[in-house]
UniProtKB/Swiss-Prot annotation:
One of its GO terms (molecular function) is ATP binding. It comes from Shigella flexneri. This is Glycine--tRNA ligase beta subunit. Its main location: cytoplasm. Belongs to the class-II aminoacyl-tRNA synthetase family. Keywords: Aminoacyl-tRNA synthetase, ATP-binding, Cytoplasm, Ligase, Nucleotide-binding, Protein biosynthesis. The lineage of its organism: Bacteria, Pseudomonadati, Pseudomonadota, Gammaproteobacteria, Enterobacterales. It catalyses: tRNA(Gly) + glycine + ATP = glycyl-tRNA(Gly) + AMP + diphosphate. It is found in: Cytoplasm. GO terms for biological process: arginyl-tRNA aminoacylation; glycyl-tRNA aminoacylation.
Amino acid sequence: MSEKTFLVEIGTEELPPKALRSLAESFAANFTAELDNAGLAHGTVQWFAAPRRLALKVANLAEAQPDREIEKRGPAIAQAFDAEGKPSKAAEGWARGCGITVDQAERLTTDKGEWLLYRAHVKGESTEALLPNMVATSLAKLPIPKLMRWGASDVHFVRPVHTVTLLLGDKVIPATILGIQSDRVIRGHRFMGEPEFTIDNADQYPEILRERGKVIADYEERKAKIKADAEEAARKIGGNADLSESLLEEVASLVEWPVVLTAKFEEKFLAVPAEALVYTMKGDQKYFPVYANDGKLLPNFIFVANIESKDPQQIISGNEKVVRPRLADAEFFFNTDRKKRLEDNLPRLQTVLFQQQLGTLRDKTDRIQALAGWIAEQIGADVNHATRAGLLSKCDLMTNMVFEFTDTQGVMGMHYARHDGEAEDVAVALNEQYQPRFAGDDLPSNPVACALAIADKMDTLAGIFGIGQHPKGDKDPFALRRAALGVLRIIVEKNLNLDLQTLTEEAVRLYGDKLTNANVVDDVIDFMLGRFRAWYQDEGYTVDTIQAVLARRPTRPADFDARMKAVSHFRTLEAAAALAAANKRVSNILAKSDEVLSDRVNASTLKEPEEIKLAMQVVVLRDKLEPYFAEGRYQDALVELAELREPVDAFFDKVMVMVDDKELRLNRLTMLEKLRELFLRVADISLLQ
């Protein structure tokens, strides 16, 4: 069977840059699935994406589905005919479904009996006939949150469509996709190359688009070119470009023919905190900032034009003129804000609502101040500095700079606090209170910052859960999942001696009578333990290991982490599987018994050597392991408990627990309960699979 290259290109208006990669990757994944489901043999499916096009190129696509031999077994002969040999309704219905009559069916004989059988040779459908629907289906499944309609048509897509190119080899596949009749016309760059041209063969793509249309359709190639050219441009001025992945992706999605240029701004603007300048360059203008080798911002930036100009200096000057007013604004705001102390913004916090039922930002500030001081006392941080940081924590939200450049919240608080002469750990805490902002982000660097970051997040968690507005489905407007995970990460990775129970109770107490949810403390803790489950699954821990620890509901995050590591290590021991099974057996035995057990085992009642030996070892280990549990040495404790495998196995092999002798039965049940309690000091080992 011959093979050909298939090309589909959808020419559109400018596509959303932040969604371009996901649209192209989904298009490729959807179409690959369509090919596989149709049984069409094919080679590599390569995707292309530029601001005004999505395209796929499929190598070695078979021209038709393979022919198939199908068999459909019908009713058994005994059920297919009545006593007179007439076909039953079941046989006739089956035959109708196969498109034949009963007398046309074959018979299949096996050692288990005889059945009606339908065999057929199904010729594979041509690829040409299948492709239009496959393309349409793949496009319909794209992850587009908001569709748009254009003109008088009822067609919906992410952006208006102008061209649809469908080529199988050198042949146009006739189809109407998204309201456009397919042909071999492709549009080039808006301002360079040929605005429109025809493509003779799918194999010519994307080279023909580069040569005649001045468009680099390969997304990864454009991105790599921008990165390499920007690095070289920065090197030429003795610096390093800030090529953050997210901005690099966005810029690659904005240009069809990237031309990297270097511009500059006035050095006087370097007196403004670098974060504000960078926010303007990256966020507003999509420029790449440039840093010196010592990490200081240089008065230069790198940008990407979408055109080759005969006079690039004109483009450079234009961009310099555009950015200058923005930098001047930042300079003005910075100088204006510093004319008063950060603390002077406190009264204005009373004018901003945190949440309708929970009060203003000033109310939140008072709670954070108190909670940060309480946390600082628990973890050995400077209480005065923590409460000071809490008092100032939201003041920068009232500054001109943060009002204009919202992403500078926190960092501007740090700069203004330093200007006011606040303690360094207080200033740093104002910046780091929002950390970690995302998975893998840095944690607060000092104890005061940790106290403030935890206080801010716990106040939000307690308040929102306290009025019954916990996250539902994908909706989490107050970012409570991120807040909970942030608290857990700080406590675990900084090894802080904090208990979620008392921490949550204190956060709730500070709200006074504002909260309406009577179960708020338990709800917050359960929610945070649920975040633990997700965290440890991402870390590669098995679900049953997590469940074994969660069953004990440890509310000290550092303690939870120690238990997780201990159970994970325990699973590597030879005795683990047997002891997990034994714990499950003990758990089941105890669950079925409703008898009241004694507080201790009566040694004089024990009879069998196996139970005497096990009872003695349980007593010895109970005393030996008490300091282990007190110190959180759970891994060492489980290693010691692994030594119980042999006596536990011997006990269950030789000793009957549920005997008629009540005193003996209760004594044995008590011993098993004491055995299980030892393991439960760490986790519920019976849940391990």
